[in-house]
């Protein structure tokens, strides 16, 4: 290809004039014997005209190996040789080519349809058309690749966005699932807590009901036992035998009429009896009492007036109580368990065993811990054998009393009996000292006391001579018995006047028993009973003032009516185990009285005792009602207080639960809010990271495009330099040919650019010597076309689809140069400014 231009340069025509004139489009290629040089816009057809500047990188170095396929035989990086045809002929020869055809498919029709120029050699025209077509194909392929790349990036971005949406939806779903699980856990925990509280409440209610029922049972049982134990002391006096009736009549003194000097003994005995009652087995069953129940029991344990009256009567009449207590069985101590049995069955002796035929003492029958059994030995050991035989005879003869067997004592009861016996021994010693002191004080006895003592001594041999009747065989004899010594006998002690005067109830019962007694006693018993009744009346006559001073607060005189000779013997009897005495009281009651005054006196005494009994019972009932009322009020107050405390506790518990629940909900909300904020922060960080990744990716792509663009610019610069030199040589040869053959092109060039023609005329000789400014003059239109694009009609790389418009825009360049004075100065300026334009690109 280079051989043609070099041959044309050797033709010898002057080419300097035509080298600087741009070619003018001709109307038709047929009429021109010599076609003009191609326009400058067709020199570098790199990229398609409709590509934006940012997408120039598509024409990378990958497309450059396509250029050696052209049959032009060019060697080097030149993309396209100069075109020989005019733009109009090129447009005609191009025709309606499809945009999607490849470069290999488009070559044969372009070779066949392209007319060969007449003046240009045949080796130049086919490579030019092929290069143009290849450039168009490359542009189209580059455009397609850019579109595919854009589609790929859009699809990738859509995939990224879709993945991000999926991840966001998954995070939301996980958060909702976590919230749901937490809510379910909270509900389950609340249900479990509510069920646990309900079970605890039911358990507390059940325990409370059971505890209240146990307390009620314990209180009722304790109160019933205490009432039974306390009132049984008085009840035993009314339900027992006539001997007990007499002792009950003695004990019916009110508390106001008791003497003052007995208070210390009563207080001692009361404290001991309270301790005994408190430590009893019935108390041990209800030890688990609260404070207020203990206070109630303590209040109930305080002595009443009747209790003090009985205690004072026991102290006032110690001789009778001690004599009666001597017949107490060792197995029948003052135990609470056998008190009710002795009250219900009455004191019946055991007839089967010879040593068991012992009457029960009245104090042990009444289950009173205050009056102990003085002696544990039975009456058989102190009485003579004859008396024992006489006593057993009427019982064996025809006694209607049933046989009573004593139950076996358990080890616990034996231990209790031993403890009570020790306490009784202590009380006996204290009472013995007190009585001995009183006996010393009452040594000068009154003649009435001596008289009663003499009558008692007279009655004692009679009572010894006769056996006891079946009705009186259950009671203890009241008179002293002789000492167990063989030859030594104690002087008999007289009974007290109150002991001789029996109560009206006792007399009535004696009459009934006398009627019911068997008639086998005989006339001897009747005569003896009559004599005994007359003696009793005689002894009761001097002792009649004894009941009258009973209401007075002065002490009763029975203790003082004892002879002084009895003091040492009585002390000896008390220190040693005393023996029972034969009975002094009449064993058979009299049928009635014939004295009107005696009957009136007995009736008045009976009425007085009944009135006192009613008053005592009424007072005790009032006190009991007050105690019950006070107890009920206290119980109601305690229940109200406990209920208020429970309600306050329930309110406090509910408030505490509400606070805990609110705190738990607040903590849960804070935790959920914190989790939400953390999730949002993580999502923001993820989005920021993805955005930075995309930006980095886009920057990398942009950098790659810039690098490709720079490489392309460098290639374009090298290509332009080589093309400018070749084009200048071709134009010189063409101008020389044109000047030699036809002058019309020269005229046209002169008409269009007179300033440039003048410059070419002035400097036609040193063309090869001035390549410094001639090369930029050729490069100026190309730089304007390929660089800045001053006109909107031009496309990016100077390749236009409509050739005439591009030629017209190039034809304006000499008109813009007209206002300057000299074209040389403008060209010099253009030479200076053109490198700056290239640097900006």
From Swiss-Prot:
Modified residues (Phosphoserine): 70, 86, 93, 113, 116, 123, 125, 254, 273, 313, 366, 399, 442, 446, 452, 454, 460, 479, 496, 544, 548, 552, 742, 753, 834
Biased composition annotated in UniProt, kind: Polar residues: 365-377
Subcellular location: Cytoplasm, Cytoskeleton, Spindle; Cytoplasm, Cytoskeleton; Cytoplasm, Cytoskeleton, Microtubule organizing center, Centrosome; Midbody
Compositionally biased region (Low complexity): 460-473, 562-576
Coiled-coil segments: 128-222, 412-441, 593-721
Main function: Microtubule-stabilizing protein involved in the control of cell motility and neurite outgrowth. Facilitate microtubule stabilization through the maintenance of acetylated stable microtubules.
Family per similarity comment: Belongs to the MAP7 family.
Protein name in the entry: MAP7 domain-containing protein 1
UniProt lineage: Eukaryota, Metazoa, Chordata, Craniata, Vertebrata
